[in-house]
Amino acid sequence: MNYDNYWDEDKPELNITPLVDVMLVLLAILMVTTPTLTYKEEIALPSGSKTARATQDKVIEIRMDKDAKIYIDSQTYEYNSFPDTFNLLSKKYDKDTRVSIRADKRLTYDKVIYLLKTIKEAGFLKVSLITSP
């Protein structure tokens, strides 16, 4: 009788299917119970005033049409004389004031850059270009 072959054929095999089933059930229980766990922290929040509102910053809106005419509020300015005029006008505003530029799409690139350069030379750093959707 050959005992070596007998032991080789009868080796026990590890069945992991029940182990996987148990782990999946534990995972499902963990996923269901985790959102219900809440931690209660006592936080004393400062009280705010209901009447105080955030002040909206002043914005200078500069518009330039296809003929290179520049508009600020209801005033019209010429393209060539705009840097000098804007330097005088900018003294009324704080240099942290936001400046928005709305330029016609038919303008050439250099005219818009000229406008940006003029605004930067006046000391304004918060400049944005407005586009239409």
Curated annotation (Swiss-Prot):
One of its GO terms (biological process) is protein transport. It comes from the Bacteria. Its main location: membrane. It is a single-pass type II membrane protein. This is Putative biopolymer transport protein ExbD-like 1. Disulfide bonds: none annotated. It comes from Helicobacter pylori (strain J99 / ATCC 700824) (Campylobacter pylori J99). GO terms for molecular function: transmembrane transporter activity. The chain crosses the membrane at residues 16-32. One of its GO terms (cellular component) is plasma membrane.
